[in-house]
């Protein structure tokens, strides 16, 4: 039973007093009698009836109801929702306005047809979706479970919908939890159960849940009838990682409740026979349903622009109606005396005044011209976007075979935003890297152990990369980077040395096997778990073992170790137990290894602490060495393993070795003690090899495997103890008192244990070096011990810098020994924090900070996180596409910088500005210094101070194209502390301006809040389109802030995916998603929206021009049936198909020419001037389509509809031909829809004209179309008018493609010229690799040859014309697949460097060229040809002549004249390109022609 705590009444009106809602809720058992009931049986029966009626405790029951409508509420509720869209309100208003007799233009019922049709389609879709939800709800609500019945005194089967808060539920293995349940009993002897949360967050690794304190010690089975405790917990919320509360027993004692005690709805019980719990939250109050908010809705940039243009159309509609109203009023005033000839007077003989007639005319024109607002545009956009999402999901190139996952489109309405991204913000760990940690190096007590053998072993797992073999020796690398540690400096560093490759290039089979296993365990491949020990460290471990073996029967065992050996011992103990790793068996992957020792439970109260740590208990409570040895022999690990075969077919059986073989150990010259324990290890090797570790963090698994390599083996973890297997000492069981988990603020985790050898309370801490080094106990320089500790810390810090410089992730390991008094004092405050319901997180945080102080440094580790496949190539392609990439990581600065070099985010020959500051004043000074340096290098001036906004010089959305004096823009590296200062209000403008001038930005040690603040800053200040990509929970905030959020389903769960708009398996798929699908989606939608605006404007223009011939009386010459259904039926399907299937550029051209992506960034397809040009063209076409039929039928005896029907026919044909001009890729569906539209129009017209004999007397459309089909003038007019109307657009498109083409038009021209030969030219600037000669056959099986037209003059720039010759395969190229790179050069072997400046491409000429001939064009701010490759020679244009020969020849002449002008104007600017002669190649290894924003010619 649950009751709300009484709250104070708030003042209010009489009769409407309301209580302030409390922050907690009280839950009681439903089996208890209600308060005030005298008869328990009667009270119980009453409570049972209340529960069955679904009103128990007046709270929501467990019934799931996701439907929005009922049979009675569907129509009004759905209409109410649809009328929230302004367009629907507008069209309904117009339809209702048509019911006014004085202003109606159409039949009232007919005017409602379009809007009713749109509303009906939307309503039917909503009804179907709601019905699907109803079926799903019914299925879930009628699932069964066991609920305890008071009347029957046993568990009975009931439906999920019959469960209420306060019920006791019993779940068996593999059953799904029906509600949020507090765990009170488990069949596990340790009070544990394992759950799978895949249905909740997508994570397949099992999680442990613990029985509430006080119930796990019960010997007998839990009886719900005896449960009388009261539960106080927090209100329902959607935080899956948080649950706070307490349970109050009859004796008044409280026990804290945490998320480990809560079983969430939707999770599945695994590896536990049965559990019992009480329902805390039911139905829609459960955390799962509170998190189920449905698909995210965002409004795309194109949609926002479209809404603005719709407003312009509304304004244009008002202006046209107002113009007609004024014209009609003036016309009435002028012909006042002749009004009786054309106006029917009223019954009293009076007539309308000019003003009144003008007002009526205004309203009537609003109705007539309503088509100007595209009624079907929004529905068409939804259909096109749904189809785009479908095709993206069906792209097999976005499927990852290794992880068996594919791209997911979670946001259905921002697909076009993928084609307009300007800034990418990326996490590092798990996004650019694999997040599969491999132990590489460590330092203990100031001594470094390089693990060279382990490095050599890892090298065998990756292929040799010839381009990255030149590595500077480690010492030089360290010395050069030694200055990185300064915290208040700004440096411009020229990177000269190479970095070690971090790319994993092992076999695909191994990678696939490892990824399959990674779904269930943290690390499973041999590369990641088989650690080769360092001989020196192994010798230290052996020496430590000898000392412990000699003193094994003495009391103070660890006191016999030297300080160095003691640190070694504690170092590996900390690696083993300072984590949350769960031990499992491969035979039963979901079965925890249990070797239970009879130890006392964890400390939960002060009384328990006093009893536990009295002197008598300290001597008798700990296990002796002899007993530990006995435990080792009596509790064989193999006996605890089930003998049943594995039921998980997806998991592979892994054989894990325990350390080195005995022969290898003996060969190192170890003592006989080492031989003895080595022989013992060999005996238990078969059982120990069956261990498997499941870790929530990859770092933890790597460290546990590293400790295992040194024979410190984690064999068991329970909620109150951790067992470790050691040589000679056997199995040590550490009592686990507390676990202080990792969080992004503390950046560390700690465990509090009682040591079995000393009975001391130890705190082991591991975390980031930036925080742990500051928590160490102060050292005195007076005594020798203090000086020694300072020396150790200094050495450790130097080694940490070495590890970070090599790209390794660093962690520091520390320890603290607590006295009894210190622990008692801390425990009291910690228990108070645990039992607090308000500010519990803050209190626990402060409690952890008080404990993690005065630490003793043990050592540090370096873990390698390898780059994902294809990351450098993807970053290079994205940069060529004009995208600026920022990496926001929480890693150490040196580590992040090294990874940035490895993934080509930073280049070795570029300048790097490193910004580290210790205060806000220092950060401001450093920013000013950086800005001065930027100005001195020839970049833009510093921003001026503005109010609330960045300077106007920030108006450019794309990254600046200006470069430094050395030709490259610098990169910026900033640490987390400096970033916090830079994000302050008074410094953010300077920081943003500096970052905008940099080629790359790397933010290190950044928190999740800082990540989101950086994204928000760029998005709001620069008005740029942003994309954030990450894989972990710490990336959720920036993913949600960005315009487009992309999540990666990696090692850290599915939180990022659940918060994202799109989910990709790996980072490399971002290239295809943006450059290909993003460009296509934007281009299709932009052109479709423009076409809808054009089509409606052109059709409205026909009606508007007619007003000049009818006195602006709002009359129409087109039948109202055509007016109503023309845009809705006859002309809506072809643009829809084009919007779904059109491809302006083939896939291979886009992928090999990322520069084409810039068209979307610059909004070339849809910008304001394009919109108004389109509207002007529509007005011209409407004038032509009106004038020619008017002249053709002038002075004829045809009636109004006979003249209007050819106009409608001409409009339809003009629309389709216009669409044909704008369509880039024609498919059979395009032809079918166009033919269907024409056929449908004539069919409807013939049927309608034949059946409508007396529709609109006296002028009726009877037999109109039949008569026109027999008139030659009709055919002549329908043929001539569309050609005349479209001639200017056709001429402009042809002229534009030949004189001033855009990059996209050039790419399309090459594709249209020869699909078989277009791939080679466009790939000459794709990736910058050169072959040995032009006749070399590549992996694709094609050979590229070069040639030039024979008619080309020798003085003209040589243009390559390529052809593909395939041996044994078809001659055509599959345009749906990316084409491999081919080159057009001969006789070259050295690769030519690529141009990295934005807007530049590389052209390699096949002809001879002087040494180092380069022409760099200045940016003009306008998108122009990629290179001279696309500007064809003068006479080669004759080959492009299409059916419109006059236009093509005129374009050729203009191109010839323009070429000569350019050649004359640039005489002497660039080096001439020599004419082609035979097979002569270039005379050097690096001959290229750089063509920028403007196309230049060299003589």
UniProtKB/Swiss-Prot annotation:
**Keyword Transmembrane helix on entry:** yes
Q: How is its activity regulated?
A: Inhibited under hypotonic conditions.
Compartments, record wording: Cell membrane; Endoplasmic reticulum membrane
UniProt lists compositionally biased (Basic and acidic residues) regions at: 1330-1340
Record topology, Exoplasmic loop segments: 107-110, 333-362, 1109-1119, 1193-1199, 1250-1267
- Cytoplasmic-side positions: 1-86, 129-309, 385-1087, 1141-1170, 1223-1228, 1293-1499
Mutating residue 208 to W has which effect? Found in a patient with autism and Parkinson's disease; uncertain significance
Principal place where this protein is found?
A: membrane
Reactions catalysed: ATP + H2O + phospholipidSide 1 = ADP + phosphate + phospholipidSide 2; a 1,2-diacyl-sn-glycero-3-phosphocholine(out) + ATP + H2O = a 1,2-diacyl-sn-glycero-3-phosphocholine(in) + ADP + phosphate + H(+); a beta-D-glucosyl-(1<->1')-N-acylsphing-4-enine(out) + ATP + H2O = a beta-D-glucosyl-(1<->1')-N-acylsphing-4-enine(in) + ADP + phosphate + H(+)
Region described as Disordered: spans on this chain: 1-53, 464-531, 1311-1356, 1464-1499
Q: What is the effect of changing residue 203 to Q?
A: Impairs PC-flipping activity
Query: What's an example GO BP annotation here?
Result: monoatomic ion transmembrane transport
Instruction: Locate the residues binding Mg(2+).
Output: 427, 429, 1031, 1035
The prosthetic group or cofactor this protein requires is: Mg(2+)
Gene Ontology CC annotations of this record = endoplasmic reticulum; endoplasmic reticulum membrane; membrane; phospholipid-translocating ATPase complex; plasma membrane
Q: Where are the transmembrane segments?
A: 87-106, 111-128, 310-332, 363-384, 1088-1108, 1120-1140, 1171-1192, 1200-1222, 1229-1249, 1268-1292
**Residue sites binding ATP per the record:** 427-429, 700, 742, 766, 809, 889-891, 1005, 1011, 1034-1035
- UniProt keyword terms in alphabetical order: ATP-binding, Cell membrane, Endoplasmic reticulum, Lipid transport, Magnesium, Membrane, Metal-binding, Nucleotide-binding, Phosphoprotein, Translocase, Transmembrane, Transmembrane helix, Transport
Annotated active site: 427
Q: Which residues are recorded as modified (Phosphoserine)?
A: 466
Q: Which family does it belong to?
A: Belongs to the cation transport ATPase (P-type) (TC 3.A.3) family. Type IV subfamily.
In UniProt terms, what function does this protein have? Catalytic component of P4-ATPase flippase complex, which catalyzes the hydrolysis of ATP coupled to the transport of phosphatidylcholine (PC) from the outer to the inner leaflet of the plasma membrane. Initiates inward plasma membrane bending and recruitment of Bin/amphiphysin/Rvs (BAR) domain-containing proteins involved in membrane tubulation and cell trafficking. Facilitates ITGB1/beta1 integrin endocytosis, delaying cell adhesion and cell spreading on extracellular matrix. Has low flippase activity toward glucosylceramide (GlcCer).
Assembly information from the UniProt record = Component of a P4-ATPase flippase complex which consists of a catalytic alpha subunit ATP10A and an accessory beta subunit TMEM30A.
Please identify the protein, giving its name as recorded.
Phospholipid-transporting ATPase VA
